[in-house]
């Protein structure tokens, strides 16, 4: 898999552990060469009767993958120990150059804690969505070619020290 990636990111938060104000934005794209444009194969009928021929469709994976992530932090009062609202929006899209040569790799695996790193398919990106089982929002047969995740958190610091930061939070989250 040969790909070229570009990322544009900006972070204006005031603290990396417990941000009280600012924002964090990133937009990225990963592109592979459109190998099927340089090939004389007709992928609409390619590999219909031959397993080895069908498997060779994925010798050179081609896709374009777009992602956008945004977080904003807003303090509700002044001072060091103040409640903070964090809002989040993110989406991703895995596209293809040839509709008969969709990539089964680099898909999105959505739902769950996002910490296990386990998915049922190879080379999937795990997208956490609290309150759901791991992977439960990726429809079977759709392979997770797109996702959207929206959320908000209300955070309250319990202890903010140089060596330890502890805070309580309530959240609402949704996605597909």
Model-derived features with residue positions:
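Generic long, charged, amphipathic alpha-helical segments
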Residues: 164-166, 170
């Amino acid at each position: 898999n040969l790909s070229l990636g570009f990322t544009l990111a900006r972070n204006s938060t005031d603290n990396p552990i417990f941000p009280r104000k600012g924002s964090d934005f990133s937009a990225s794209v990963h592109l592979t060469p459109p190998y099927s444009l340089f090939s004389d194969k007709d992928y609409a009928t390619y590999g219909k009767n031959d397993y080895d021929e069908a498997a060779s469709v994925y010798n050179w994976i081609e896709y374009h993958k777009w992602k956008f992530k945004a977080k904003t932090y807003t303090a509700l009062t002044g001072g060091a120990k103040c409640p903070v609202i964090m809002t989040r929006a993110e989406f991703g899209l895995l596209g293809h150059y040839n509709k008969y040569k969709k990539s089964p790799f680099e898909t999105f695996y959505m739902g769950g804690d996002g910490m296990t790193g386990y998915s049922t398919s190879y080379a999937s990106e795990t997208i956490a969505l609290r309150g759901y089982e791991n992977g439960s929002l990726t429809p079977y047969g759709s392979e997770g070619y797109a996702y959207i995740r929206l959320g908000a958190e209300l955070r309250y610091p319990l202890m903010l020290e140089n060596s330890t930061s502890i805070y309580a939070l309530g959240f609402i989250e949704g996605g597909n």
